[in-house]
A protein has these predicted regions:
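Hydrophobic alpha-helical transmembrane segments
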Residues: 2-68, 76, 80-82, 88, ...
C-alpha cells in the first residue's frame, strides 16, 4: 500500500510539472476535456465513447513520455547533437502515431453516427 501511495504522489507531481512547464501537455489536456463533452454528442454508443476518450488519454500519456525523453536528452547534453535529435524525433513520431490513432477512431465514430458506416 505504501508503494501505491508513493507511486500516486510521483504521478501527481509529474502531471503538475507537465502542466506547468509543457505547452504540448496543456494543449492535449484541453483536447481531452473538449473530447469528454464532444464525445457525448458524437459517440454512437457507450463503447464508442470509451474508445474515443481512451485514445485521447493515450495521446496525453504518449506526450508525457515524449516530454520525459526530451527532458532527459536535454539533461544529458544541452548542445545540438545528431543522435539526440533522432531520439527526440522518435518521441515526436510516437505522439504523431497516437494522434493519428485518435483521429481515426474519432472520424470512424462520426461516420457511424452519421450512418456512413455500419
Amino acid at each position: 500500500m505504501k508503494r501505491l501511495y508513493s507511486a500516486t504522489q510521483n504521478s501527481i507531481r509529474g502531471v503538475i510539472d507537465g502542466f506547468k512547464t509543457e505547452p504540448a501537455v496543456r494543449d492535449e489536456a484541453v483536447l481531452v476535456l473538449v473530447g469528454l463533452l464532444l464525445g457525448l454528442v458524437i459517440a454512437p454508443s457507450g463503447t464508442w465513447y470509451a474508445a474515443m476518450i481512451g485514445t485521447l488519454l493515450i495521446v496525453l500519456a504518449v506526450e508525457f513520455l515524449n516530454t520525459g525523453i526530451e527532458k532527459l536528452a536535454d539533461h544529458v547534453t544541452p548542445e545540438q547533437h545528431s543522435e539526440i535529435r533522432r531520439i527526440k524525433d522518435f518521441g515526436s513520431a510516437a505522439v504523431f502515431c497516437s494522434l493519428s490513432l485518435a483521429g481515426l477512431v474519432w472520424l470512424t465514430a462520426l461516420a457511424v453516427r452519421c450512418g456512413l458506416l455500419g
